[in-house]
């Protein structure tokens, strides 16, 4: 398991201040505002590195699901002046959540229809893990309004991207059917830009590393926070391709949701569906904060402006939430994107009980496909307690709807 420890410098313990749910420390003379109770040692190292950046703006924010990442913790929110950091966005650019409420009462859906027609139908129509469609999907599903011919990575990946759109991916990506606290069926899914986002992220991070070395940058290469300045043409190139990946990730989720709705409507012809809620959690955007126009990097964090509707999923077999943002300026109008890992995937496989995980899900009558130890990578025990995460961000979001899983498909 990842070690949960105090901040690297003991003197920081004396600098800790609490403001409702938020805690504040100073690191390298930079305020770090935290909504997280425990942070692993790797994440603390990344926080220390981030606070050395000369272009960091105002403060660094860490959401309650924060844990170690690559360059920047997952659950981190970083504002910068005049630079973008590809690794502070991550490689699953535009990854996010979407959810749809139906008019169907869960108790009125026959179990055999749920298992044999709906869940089986989803598995047949939506490729999972590293799988993709054998044939390119219709171009109408792809993002529009972009000059892809000027995009180095996207342009050469368009053919394969048309086979990836409408696919779930692996890791912590999922499709869930859920029961709302009023008894109605919801559909929720978590997915991103597939291999396209990874190709774009890796390409521009490597480009930034090369340029930073050429410029004798003061940002050390070993902290994995290479940057592209606004004045450089590479900034505009990355920004255009990042925005395309965000749009592609949304198009990917929309296509999957449309096909899930079709499957449900085929099985239950009286089904109707409300408009889709969508929110991304890996991206950078120009925003105004504390009187200045800055670039906000959200890596495993979502925008939570006043009245903004969002989605915060729990871990496998636990509650998920539809929320309303409270627009807290101290978090750069952000909140968590989920529960957040408490242990690595390898530690979860090594230490958690397969029998206990299956028994826990089946005791709740949740339809699942857990078969082997590798499936423990995404077990609930590998994640933080979602109820504690939500309590820690009571000043960031307000819970509107509580959702409980009835069936889950993992990538």
What are these regions (language model features)?
Residues 13-14, 98-100, 345-346:
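Iron-sulfur (Fe-S) cluster-binding segments and ferredoxin-like electron-carrier domains
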Residues 66-67, 95:
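Acidic, glycine-rich active-site loops and adjacent beta-strand->loop/helix elements
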Residues 25-46, 55-62, 68-74, 78, ...:
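Domain-length cofactor-binding catalytic modules of enzymes
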Residues 88-148:
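A generic, well-ordered mixed alpha/beta core segment in the N-terminal half of proteins
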Residues 19-24:
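Low-complexity, highly charged intrinsically disordered N-terminal segments
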Residues 51:
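Beta-strand elements of modular eukaryotic interaction domains
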Residues 5, 9, 95-98, 180, ...:
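Generic recognition of cysteine residues
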Residues 1-17:
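BZIP DNA-binding basic region
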